[in-house]
Amino acid sequence: VTATSQHHATSSPAEHLDSTTVVSWKAPISFAVVTALLAVLFLTTRHSGDAVFRLSAPRDLIQIPEIVLNGPVTTWTCVVVMTAITVAAAALVRAKRRVPLWVVVIFAVIGLVAFLTWAAAGARTPVIPLPGLLAGALSLSVPLIFGALCGVISERVGVINIAIEGQLLAGAFTSAVVASVIGQQWLGPIVGLFAAAISGVLVAFVLAAFSIKYFVDQVIVGVVLNVLVIGLTSFLFSQVLAPNAALLNSPPRLQRIPIPLLSEIPLIGPMFFRQTLIVYAMYVIIALVYIGLFHTRWGLRLRSVGEHPTAADTVGINVARTRFWNVSLAGAIAGFGGAFFTLGAVGAFNKEMTAGAGFIALAAVIFGQWDPIRATLAALLFGFASNLQNTLSVIGSPVPSEFMLMLPYIVTILAVAGFVGKVRGPAAAGKPYIKA
């Protein structure tokens, strides 16, 4: 539902929209729907207990007192505040003004507090351990972030990478086998990480060869590669890894490395500074991709090829070579991230253990509007939804288990369809370039 301004703005462009700008009612309508759903939930399933939010882990140097919230009072207070925000958002749209992003963030946080309070107040153990919830969310986000960075680079250079799922799975499989064969506590996982990156490059190499050199539809190639990697790894797992699990599928896991002092900061410390080597590498890769894309000659060439390959070719940029090598680089990043499944989380390879993470990463790329920082934040949102499912199950929340299993995917759908709006990707993404 949209409304178009019929008069020119009298204030600054940041506050009001001109006559050609379309104002969207999507935010107020979304706010109203979420508020109504929470109100119905709180009315039909009343929980009269208290909810306890634990802000410090037992090992933290600084202990912060727990926050105890009364269930009914907190939930209905949040509903009232959310209703007020909804009315304010509607007023902004009626006045031909955009709803700021910070308003959306505040609304989401208040809604989350209301839901967590309601869920904990009716649980067997009404304690929400926020340090564990946040640290676990980051851990579950790691492969999503690597996959999202892979997707950003690929699509920015003009190649739609549906094969992120296959690259993650190939990385998980290869890292498990290589680390198991080497066996040493530190050397095995480190070599396994490099092997995972190489396997991601191999999958990306096939994608690049067929889509760039032979002009095969990029989406079709990506889907075929996903099916191929799933089938190949499943076959090798059944025929090779399972009968020889002690030798080929028992990789040593990466150990957590706490950063002195920083790891003791309440909430933030356990989440960011008490992690494994692959997570610290992720921080560096995020920064490098962002700086490289927007502040280096390499990034300028990459983006020009993805936006206007003909113009890039005119000024002397080899379009095919630029696409080929950057798709391969993206595959290395995804393969490296896939190693987290075996070396950082589970500790052994299982069939189809990525469980659609590549497709959620692709959604994070769209949600993040092809920006590495925004895509990372989107992946963190999806990881938080996944870990919230685990946390509520542990505390014995009355939320049905079927809904909890659906929660990460519901958040993905709502984020991409409900809050992104109309976004435009790289102009030449998915279009083969044929040199005249």
Question: How would you label these PLM feature ranges?
Answer:
Residues 1-59, 76-117, 288-289, 307, ...:
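Cytosolic-side transmembrane-helix boundaries in multi-pass membrane proteins
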Residues 58-67, 230-294, 349, 397-404, ...:
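Transmembrane helix-bundle core of multi-pass membrane transporters
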Residues 213-238, 248, 352-366, 378-418:
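Pore- or pathway-lining transmembrane helices of multi-pass membrane proteins that form conduits
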Residues 42-62, 99-102, 124-137, 242-251:
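Interfacial/capping segments of alpha-helical transmembrane domains
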Residues 153-174, 190, 212-225, 301, ...:
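Short, non-helical or kinked segments that cap or interrupt transmembrane helices
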Residues 85-86, 132-182, 193, 202-219, ...:
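Single transmembrane alpha-helix segments in multi-pass membrane proteins
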Residues 46-50, 126-129, 134, 293, ...:
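Inter-helical junctions in multi-pass inner-membrane proteins, predominant
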Residues 272-349, 372-373, 377:
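Helix-loop-helix "hairpin" substructures at the membrane interface of multi-pass membrane proteins
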